[in-house]
Amino acid sequence: NMDDNFIGCEKLFPFYQKISDVCSRIFGAKYTDPRPFTGMHCIDMITKTVCTPGSKMLILSKDHGGHASVKPVVERLGVKTMDAPYDIEENDLNYNAVNKIINEQAIDYILLAPSDLIKPLDVERIDTTNCVLLWDCSQVMGLIAAGLCPNPLKTMKNIIMFGGTHKTFPGPASGLIMTNDKYLHDMMETEINPKYLRHSQMHQKISLLFALIEFEKYGSGYMSHMVHCANYLGANLRDRGYDVADVHGQISATHQIFIRCSKEEMDTIYDNAYKCEVTLNKKHKQLFYGYGIRLGTQEIARYDWNDAALDTITEILVHLSNKDIDIDTVRRLIDSLPPKKIHYAFSEDVISRFNELYMN
């Protein structure tokens, strides 16, 4: 509808179409919307356009790894929330209990936005006959695109799959909404713009398009190495005395590693990490049996670091649990790591040719 758009906006449409074409190939998505800026912005846009005040929604609680912002955001819109039943031992929802609640209490939506997970949620077990699944796949988007994680878009109805494009998917900070249900697409398509978003920052979308095409070529190898890094590093840390979580013997099917520990050890590791400029997260939630540390391997995997480098990272992480840490020793270990050179990406030659096209 040109009445609701700016003069010249039609020049942008081919780029949106190209993004849609790539997402059709790697995600199997019929309808794609890259206008949101982040994964959290996707949640904001989707719930504002699809959900109605007074409706009922199941969410993944913060204690079970859910994104802490979901509950206040949707409740601010007048949506009534309740926590989805969860099985701590399985690191997944209790799907029998979830489906029972959906059917008995006439749940309208189930919004799952996991921040912490060492195995992808088995969302295909959710009965969406009479409800809509809003699946924030930010943490596993790259794994889905690489075919290393189930893709519910291909098997389920009444689902919107979305997420941030800068976690396991190695793109710019952006958001991506996908669905194969036309009625859901129609609810969002003409409401997001012009009501809730005016400027979609096209430089960001061009970067996303470039990253999608790059991932189509190199993403499978990258994701496989990322999962290898998580399991190799986790096994090393377990051998060195850390309590590393697993699910049925597998330390991770994602990029994350869970270390369970006391509050005192958690604080020691975190404080030392801050001093040594090591990036990790501390956690206080039931998913970690109280307290713990979360590690992510998506960045080191992009450098294509080998097992020898992972052995060095193990030594660094072991030092972090020492109250009397020798910071100079840790910094020497960090300095001994390989260069931070991006792999699983277009070559410099390809990028140079792209830049030449742009300049001309």
List each language-model region with its residue ranges.
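Conserved small-domain helix->loop->beta segment predominantly found in fold-type I
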Residues: 212, 223, 227-270, 274-292
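Glycine-rich tight-turn/loop motif centered on a GG-T
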Residues: 5-9, 300-303
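PLP-dependent enzyme catalytic core of the Aspartate aminotransferase-like
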Residues: 289-360
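N-terminal "arm"/small-domain region of PLP-dependent enzymes with the aminotransferase-like
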Residues: 1-6, 82
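Short hydrophobic/aromatic beta-strand micro-patches
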Residues: 178, 258-262, 296-298
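Conserved PLP-enzyme active-site core in the AAT-like
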Residues: 11-14, 18, 22-33, 37-243, ...
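Short acidic (Asp/Glu) and glycine-rich catalytic loops that position anionic groups and cofactors
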Residues: 1-2, 185-189, 207-214, 248-255, ...
